[in-house]
Regions:
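SAM-dependent methyltransferase catalytic region
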Residues: 1-195, 201-205, 214, 221-227, ...
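Flexible, glycine-/basic-rich loop-and-beta segments that form/coincide
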Residues: 205-257
Length: 257
């Protein structure tokens, strides 16, 4: 089953260093599963076919053109003169299609061009998307005065996916920080949003990084209603008590009930 799970995992990345990290992490995930399931490390003979699958399933691609990245940087814009503006255009190298394997066809899988998978589809579909957006605008001020931008990415991600999990600074949970107060209140009153994890010491999550107010992992599912966060505290038990008290007040019942 672990091999089938790896065969079913696909992804592409434009930058080569990020691609290498993704491949290594997926291989380590397989090794950790084997250690947890059978209490032993995988052998080279076991890792070799898994590494081959990963090298096919995680590939380098320009997602805009569905092709192998050319690797040539775009030339800087230059001012054209009367004689050069009518010159012959520089020929562009032909794009090279990316190939992926369907491991359910043939004993060693069947390779096919990636764009053929897209035939009949007007948009690219994803099971999940992983990203690392910036937390603040570093062009403005220092690390303590720069304006946060993670709230914009949270709003954008909610428009793209019906279920979204994010790790962000946690100040907005206390209606603090430099995010807009109106946005903070919107998040705290969102019935589809809940806090999965909170750590007040940000360095425990991101070493050597001072994140004022701590770090939170939030989960939003537009198809589920968890009840508004309202007033957030660092103690889950207290959050539960607060929610029960508020429900009593809203229903007009006595707290003694």
């Amino acid at each position: 089953y672990a091999t089938h799970a790896v065969q079913s995992t696909y992804g592409y990345e434009y930058q080569g260093d990020n691609l290498l990290l993704a491949r290594v992490n997926l291989l380590l995930t397989y090794a950790e599963h084997l250690q947890a399931r059978w209490q032993r490390k995988p052998t080279k003979e076991e890792l070799r076919p898994i590494a081959n699958i990963i090298s096919w399933n995680l590939w380098q691609m320009d997602g805009l053109h569905l092709s192998v990245p050319g690797g040539k940087p775009q030339p800087e814009t230059k001012q054209l003169d009367l004689f050069s503006m009518f010159g012959a255009a520089e020929p562009q190298p032909p794009t090279v299609s990316c190939k992926v394997k369907n491991w359910r066809k043939g004993s060693h899988g069947t390779a096919q061009n990636f764009e053929t998978i897209q035939e009949g589809s007007t948009s690219m579909k994803f099971d999940y998307v992983i990203g690392n957006p910036p937390y603040q605008d570093e062009r403005q001020g220092t690390s303590t005065t720069a304006l946060p931008v993670y709230n914009n990415f949270m709003d954008a991600s909610y428009k793209v996916g019906s279920s979204v999990m994010l790790i962000t600074p946690a100040r907005f949970l206390f209606n603090a920080g430099r995010t807009p107060k109106q946005w903070n209140e919107q998040m705290l009153n969102d019935e589809h949003l809940k806090v999965l994890y909170y750590e007040k010491d940000g360095e425990k999550v991101f070493p050597n990084t001072d994140i004022k107010g701590g770090v939170a992992i939030t989960y939003r599912d537009e198809k589920q209603s968890y009840g508004a966060i309202g007033t957030f505290t660092i103690f889950p038990e207290l959050n539960l008590i607060l929610r029960k008290v508020k429900n009593k007040i809203v229903k007009g019942n006595s707290l003694a009930d």
